[in-house]
Amino acid sequence: MLILDRSSPQIFISNEQQDVDIDLQSVQRLVILFLELQKVSTDQVYIYFLSDAALAQLHDEQFSDPSLTDTITLPIDRPGIQSFPHVLGEAFVSPRAAMRFLGQYTEAQLYHEISRYVVHSLLHMLGYDDQTDEDKRIMREQEDSSLTFLAQNQALLHPTV
């Protein structure tokens, strides 16, 4: 578990999988810059990287669906809600899902896809949905523009240096 810089929101990060090496400071940088881009203020965000088995179990517990998925988001406090501490939510991500989705990939493509999963969860925490085709289109546009911004600011996920 990594907790950094108390002047910024606390980003709690737990890497409980062993499929992909993820630099935890890159996760913090991605989340902080994403929140700045979206002009969102919060006290805490939780990001968990899990194995497929652990994510499928959580999927079953939360949604009565034991199938594999790439990410699960549990929004807690909506932006603008007064609470202390303000907890935006929890994101549970399977890096192996990105490996499976991409098939053959470069290291850069893999970390870009895992970054997309984190951004996708953060967007859910902000209230974006992907239930209808229109919602999916809007969410994909938000993902793409956020990922472009993050890439330009060297804030995509990467392996430990």
From Swiss-Prot:
Keyword Metal-binding appears in the UniProt entry: yes
Organism: Chlamydia muridarum (strain MoPn / Nigg)
Keyword flag Lyase: no
Biological process per Gene Ontology, one example term: rRNA processing
Keyword entries, A-Z: Cytoplasm, Endonuclease, Hydrolase, Metal-binding, Nuclease, Ribosome biogenesis, rRNA processing, Zinc
Localization of this protein: Cytoplasm
Family per similarity comment: Belongs to the endoribonuclease YbeY family.
SUPFAM superfamilies assigned to the protein according to its UniProt record, in alphabetical order: Metalloproteases ('zincins'), catalytic domain
GO molecular function: metalloendopeptidase activity; RNA endonuclease activity; zinc ion binding
Protein name (Swiss-Prot/TrEMBL): Endoribonuclease YbeY
Gene giving rise to this polypeptide: ybeY
Pfam annotation, one family: YbeY
Function: Single strand-specific metallo-endoribonuclease involved in late-stage 70S ribosome quality control and in maturation of the 3' terminus of the 16S rRNA.
